[in-house]
């Protein structure tokens, strides 16, 4: 992540915006959502949106192969991660992707491991399917409790919802620890769902490792 300073709009401008972030709270509250940081859109995105609106190009969205092409290059450049574009599926947001994956795998009314402290949305997403959250908290140094996770896998819980980099503590789990997680998941025929949406925010002196870039066990789980 660059150390360059990027100015945000003035507060009076922000309070005039229409997003939930700026309408939900009174004016004496300064919301600081990581996922909505109020910086100006990149010039290329602004130009494309303006072009689409001016041409009324607003119909239903079908397959968008350009997204796969863009992500393939991005993942290779950032993390040396070679992806299979045929496996990419577009969803409206991370929560929808997680919920529908679990629904498709028959997890309604089942159990899923999470690692607190973690993004509050995890409880909301799993609640949509009446899924029981099995909390295996992070260790005091914010590392994953691999032994605790394996104990739950051995007890019959077959899904883990991972947050990496971890929200809210900002921990980017090491390749060694993710590889060990993949090993125990493979051993117990479990599945890891990795929410990696904040990966591009990793500081330059830290390394983000995609779960699927951690060897055959990760690819199998």
Regions found by a protein language model. Name each.
Residues 2-94, 100:
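N-terminal small-domain helix-loop-helix segment of the aminotransferase-like
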Residues 58-183, 200-219:
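Conserved core of the PLP fold type I
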Residues 192-193:
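Residue-level marker for buried hydrophobic side chains located in beta-strands
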Residues 196:
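Walker B catalytic acidic pair
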């Amino acid at each position: 992540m660059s150390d360059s300073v990027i100015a945000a709009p003035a507060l009076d401008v922000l309070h005039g915006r229409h997003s939930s972030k700026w309408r939900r709270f009174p004016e004496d509250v300064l919301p600081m959502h990581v996922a909505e940081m109020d910086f100006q859109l990149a010039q290329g995105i602004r130009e494309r949106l303006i072009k689409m609106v001016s041409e009324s190009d607003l119909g239903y969205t079908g397959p968008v192969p350009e997204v796969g092409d863009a992500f393939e290059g991005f993942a290779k450049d950032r993390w040396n991660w070679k992806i299979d574009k045929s496996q990419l599926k577009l969803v409206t947001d991370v929560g929808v992707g997680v919920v529908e994956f679990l629904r498709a795998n028959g997890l309604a009314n089942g159990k899923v491991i999470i690692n607190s402290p973690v993004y509050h949305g995890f409880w909301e997403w799993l609640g949509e399917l009446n899924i029981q959250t099995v909390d295996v908290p992070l260790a005091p140094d914010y590392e994953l409790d691999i032994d605790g996770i394996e104990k739950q896998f051995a007890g019959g819980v077959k899904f883990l919802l991972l947050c990496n980099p971890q929200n809210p503590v900002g921990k980017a789990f090491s390749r060694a620890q993710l590889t060990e997680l993949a090993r125990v998941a493979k051993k117990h025929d479990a599945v890891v769902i990795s929410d990696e949406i904040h990966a591009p925010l990793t500081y330059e002196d830290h390394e983000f490792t995609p779960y699927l870039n951690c060897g055959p066990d990760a690819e199998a789980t």
